[in-house]
A protein has these predicted regions:
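Serine-esterase "nucleophile elbow" of acetyl-processing enzymes
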Residues: 1-55, 60, 65-74
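Alpha-helical cap/lid subdomain in secreted, periplasmic
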Residues: 33-45, 61-213
Length: 213
C-alpha cells in the first residue's frame, strides 16, 4: 500500500495596483510588512503574499493585464488598490479616467475574479496630499472616486478597506501642522515608512476578518 501525506498548500493573496503596490512588494513595503505580521502571528506558513503593482497604472491597465498577472497565478484572494492615477493624471497629463469608465472597468474586473471564485477586497485611494483642511487640490476628485469604490464594494458584496477614510482620520491628529506630505507619504501619494506600516495593518485587519484565519 502506498503511503502518502497531505502537504499544506499556502493560500495566495495578490495585491493588484499601481506604483504604491509595486513599492509595497519591495524592502520595507506594505506587503513585506504584512509578511512580518503573518510571521509574528504564526500564520506565515499558511499564506503567500504576491505583489502585482506597476507604476502609472490606472483601472483599465489592471483590466488589460489581469489575465497574465492575476488569473494565471490562481490566487485565492485579490486586494485591488487603484485610483490615484485615475484622478491624478487627469490634472497632470489629461490621461485620467472618467468616473463612469472607472466604475465600468472596476465592475468588469470584479466579475472576472468572482467567476473564478476568488475573494475580492477593494481599497479606496488613500491620498493625493496630506493636508487635513481639504485644501489639497485634488481632494474633491479623490473623495468622489473613493465614494465610487465604496458603492462598487457594496453592490458586489466585496469587503472594503477604506484607506481614504483611515488616512483622513489618522492625519487629523498626526498632522497637526497641516503639511502636504511627510506623515504617511514621501510626496503626498507614495508611502513612507510609517505609511507602509499603517497600510499593512489596515489590510491585515480587514483580511483577518474574513480570509486570514
Amino acid at each position: 500500500m502506498a503511503l502518502g501525506f497531505n502537504r499544506q498548500t499556502k493560500k495566495k493573496i495578490i495585491f493588484f495596483g499601481d506604483s504604491i503596490t509595486q513599492a509595497g512588494a519591495g524592502p520595507g513595503g506594505y506587503i513585506k510588512k504584512m509578511d512580518s505580521i503573518l510571521a509574528q502571528t504564526n500564520k506565515a506558513a499558511n499564506y503567500e503574499l504576491v505583489g502585482a503593482g506597476i507604476s502609472g497604472n490606472k483601472i483599465y491597465d489592471l483590466y488589460l493585464r489581469m489575465e497574465a498577472d492575476v488569473l494565471a497565478k490562481s490566487p485565492d484572494a485579490v486586494v485591488i488598490f487603484i485610483g490615484v492615477n485615475d484622478v491624478w493624471h487627469k490634472r497632470t497629463s489629461g490621461t485620467g479616467t472618467d468616473p463612469d469608465k472607472f466604475e465600468n472597468f472596476y465592475n468588469a474586473i470584479i466579475k472576472k475574479l468572482k467567476e473564478k471564485n476568488i475573494a475580492v477586497y477593494l481599497c479606496t485611494p488613500a491620498a493625493i496630499g496630506e493636508k487635513t483642511d481639504f485644501t489639497n487640490s485634488l481632494d474633491g476628485d479623490l473623495n468622489n472616486y473613493a465614494a465610487i469604490i465604496r458603492k462598487i464594494a457594496a453592490t458586489n458584496n466585496c469587503p472594503l478597506i477604506d484607506l481614504r477614510q483611515s488616512f483622513l482620520d489618522h492625519l487629523k491628529t498626526a498632522n497637526r501642522d497641516n503639511k502636504d506630505r511627510g506623515t504617511l507619504t514621501t510626496d503626498g501619494v507614495h508611502l513612507n515608512v510609517a505609511g507602509n506600516i499603517f497600510v499593512a495593518q489596515k489590510m491585515f485587519d480587514a483580511l483577518q476578518k474574513g480570509f486570514i484565519k
